[in-house]
Swiss-Prot record:
This is NADH-quinone oxidoreductase subunit I. [4Fe-4S] cluster 2 binds at residues 83, 119, 122, 125. Belongs to the complex I 23 kDa subunit family. Keywords: 4Fe-4S, Cell inner membrane, Cell membrane, Iron, Iron-sulfur, Membrane, Metal-binding, NAD, Quinone, Repeat, Translocase, Ubiquinone. InterPro entries: 4Fe4S_Fe-S-bd, 4Fe4S_Fe_S_CS, NADH_quinone_OxRdtase_chainI.
Amino acid sequence: MQLTNRSKVVVDKKMTFMERIYIPSIVSGMMITLSHLFKKKATIQYPEVQREFAFVYRGKHILKRDEQGRENCTACGLCAVSCPAEAITIIADERKKGEEHLYKEEKYASLYEINMLRCIFCGLCEEACPKDAVYLTEELVPAQYNRKDFIYGKDKLVQPLGTSAHPKTYKPYKK
């Protein structure tokens, strides 16, 4: 049964002697191979040679401290709400008497976890934070053997005392 009345006539063209022995195809393939031989190699020897990161690269998270060493995070939860991967978990608590040197505001994050396996490193948490507490550094997230090691708590996230929180010049866009 014919569905259309269009038909195409196929002509069986006779191949020449050169086409039958595939010499032109072999020569053109060798020319392509030889042209790639003299181009710059894309592969680098990784441990010895490392490429520079892009200017806007986002790596490992840091919870920043202020000049007095107090945590900037006030557990407002905007970073967790803005995270499209739902990788951030926050539990808020009130600052107790005598903890003024540890936390900047009355409310602080008693639990702050980022699941690095879920995180897509989009930087929305950094942009949403009104206190500039969350910061994405240029540091790579190290490889681990267990999944639970990729859930970073405050022990891995809080900026160590006496270190700079701005190793790169990239600043997130804020209005």
